[in-house]
Amino acid sequence: MIPELGHFALILATVVALIQGVLPLTGTYLPSRTLQITLQSLARPMAILQCVLVACAFAALATAFLTNDFSVTYVAQHSNSLLPKPYQFAAVWGGHEGSLLLWVLLLAVWSMAVALFSKSLPLDMVARVLGVLGLISVGFLLFILITSNPFERLLPAALDGRDLNPLLQDPGLVIHPPMLYMGYVGMSVAFAFAVAALLSGRLDAAWARWSRPWTVIAWTFLTFGIGLGSWWAYYELGWGGWWFWDPVENASLMPWLVATALIHSLMVTEKRGSFKAWTVLLAIAAFSLSLLGTFLVRSGVLTSVHAFASDPKRGVFILVFLAVVVGSSLTLFAWRAPRVTLGGRMELVSRESFLLANSVLLVVATGAVLLGTIYPLIIDALNMGKLSVGPPYFNAVFAPLLVPTVFLMVPGSIARWREAKVSEIAYTLSFSGAAAVLLAIGLPFVLGGWSLGAMLGIFLGAWVGLGTLQQVVTRLRKPGRIGLSFWGQHIAHFGIAVFVVGVTGVNSYEVERDVRMHVNDVVTIEPYSFQLKSLGEVTGPNYKAVRADVEVKRGNEVIETLQPEKRRYFSSAMPMTEAGIDTGFMRDLYVSLGEPLNDARTEWSMRVYYKPFVPWLWGGVLLMVLGGLFAALDRRYRA
């Protein structure tokens, strides 16, 4: 009965979303002022009601998982009676249908948030924004009801379920998808504000100020989600990497890059009234790329640890939806673009010009990632053979574009609006620049050897970090209140600096050993030694594992005992690797257990890593997230 109620709630939510999308938008064009206000006023209660209904549907599906209702096909496919309760709940979004329901729920949450926290915005603007969000919700709700019903019954009911994919039985699964989806879906709010501004013809500083905090919050969630996904892959997959240029990883990176450009472009539009058309295009692109990521994951065109098995009609539905969203928004833009004024004048050297250059570089980098991601799919679709585009392409094309992007962050932060002097910028940054050069020359020798990549990475990290600290110190010396947006900007920029140093350190100075080990064997990565002390079997709630005890020493001092595992799950017999990791401020020590190399299972392949600066990757991400939260909470944006 509960699954049927959940399905009915989705049907009602679709009707409510249709009302939310059609009537308020219609009301903005009626001649009667009374009728205008009446229809526009429906937007807020409809958005709240839609969120309640979708939440009821989600709760119904969660109940089916937690009660082991294997008469529901989706539950039988993605859960098991032995699955621990936290993972039973996380399994709600462990497959295609449930993850799509989570997507729709979060879209409804964003809509309700706009309805509740935009009281100072004009009613017609709120009606347009919520109307656009309502129409987007209609598209996804119809997608669920037509192709992806999570409440479909299985008769007769299965005695037990197939179990959740062992890869996903991890605490990271409980957090990573919701955070990532909050970022993905949050781009719909920036898109809705852009479309609403185009519909009203009001592309001005007020629109940018209204849109910016929502964009920053979405960017913050997306940053956190991508960081969590990278961290999960690092410790869960057992290969020690944090980014593999997987197509679905790329699908999350592309909207992040465009959203980063959008945030800074919105700032220029708010402060100077410039870049209006460019800002609108970035908002459209950010959401369109989020939809493209949805298509890549759910169409079945990709083979990936992230991708969901899917039938072709789902891919066709999303592709048509993507075409409608992009086509209609670009058509509206083309209609309104001639009426958009150019805004304030700017010189070649100014804060606006630096921010424009950076946003263009970010868009070009996005294009490079997009090309490498979809080109193999196009070649395959045209029956021109199979083509793989991997890390060599992305590292060769993407990294050179990021070097000037990161470099321009510092002068772009201190340059004056409208017009700046090169000599003034150079003088202001002379100390930071000189210190960054000295660190870039000297530190590589201290860390383990000089290379061009290490020198360049350390220079960029030091340049941004020292330049950011210099700006903070300069501002603290001046009187007056410092807004949260100032702190947010500089904390996020410092996070970029920390992240760049982390990437440089691990890429330049990582040491890896692939070894064969018996009990009591020792492998050394100076100044650490790793001794295999014992091997034993352990039993978990739904798996058995071989666990190794690896004692790590520095000299004669025992640092830690790592316990990597090789697990086999009862329901699928799928082998899984659980790495043993010791994290310090400056490095990770990482041990991964491979396969037995003899019948007696006394000799095992093992992979041992020394990973300098890896914790700085996650620290940099957390600083960016903290900066985003500070910026979004600035009192200028409270409505």
Where do the language-model regions lie?
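Hydrophobic alpha-helical membrane-insertion segments
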Residues: 49-65, 133-146, 282-290, 358-370, ...
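Membrane-interface helix-loop-helix modules in multi-pass inner-membrane proteins
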Residues: 55-130, 145-164, 226-270, 293-316, ...
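Short, aromatic-rich amphipathic segments at membrane interfaces
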Residues: 90-91, 165-170, 588-616, 620
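Soluble non-transmembrane domains of integral membrane proteins
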Residues: 514-607
